[in-house]
Amino acid sequence: MSLAQRVLIWGHGFGLERDVAYGPEPRHRLDIYTPRGRAPEATVLFFYGGTWKSGTKALYRFLGEALTRRGFQAVIADYRLYPAVRFPAFVEDAALALAWTKANIAAHGGRPDRIVLMGHSAGGYNAAMLSIDPRWLAPHG
């Protein structure tokens, strides 16, 4: 990632990397919030809700900030939305975001050995499916 692509905000006690690509589509982007001055307890990968047809990671900056204040790294991922795509694309995007996080988060100061999935509403469904149904992660090893 180039310096121009990396935005760090240190005055608030955390670093923020915006719009990191986790896949080929324009909405395959995530923001990474990392606590400053200490290693994170774990990396929390969060998927927001919005009935799979609305939402953006920027609306959940408050969550990224709150998690870093508590010693966690937060990864908040955008994913493709309806009507541009239909189910199961939402869960497939979540699986891709998790696979990227597992493979790459150490380079961003995170814990690939301690990833916690979290979500709200439709995003909670995405997180739950990754946790209980192995078919979503199977294509990613």
Language-model segment annotations:
Residues M1-R38:
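N-terminal cap/lid segment of alpha/beta-hydrolase-fold proteins
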Residues P40-G50:
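Short beta-strand element of the alpha/beta-hydrolase
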Residues E41-A42, F72, D113-R114:
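Loop/turn elements at helix/coil->beta-strand transitions in domains of secreted/extracellular proteins
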Residues G50, Q73, D78-Y82:
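Short beta-to-alpha linker loops that shape the active-site pocket of alpha/beta-hydrolase fold enzymes
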Residues S54-R61, A84-V85:
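Short N-terminal helix/helix-N-cap motif within the alpha/beta-hydrolase-1
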Residues A58-I76:
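Short amphipathic alpha-helix adjacent to the substrate-entry channel of hydrolases
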Residues V91:
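Helix-loop module immediately N-terminal to the HCX5R catalytic loop
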Residues L96-G141:
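Primarily recognizes the serine-hydrolase "nucleophile elbow" in alpha/beta-hydrolase
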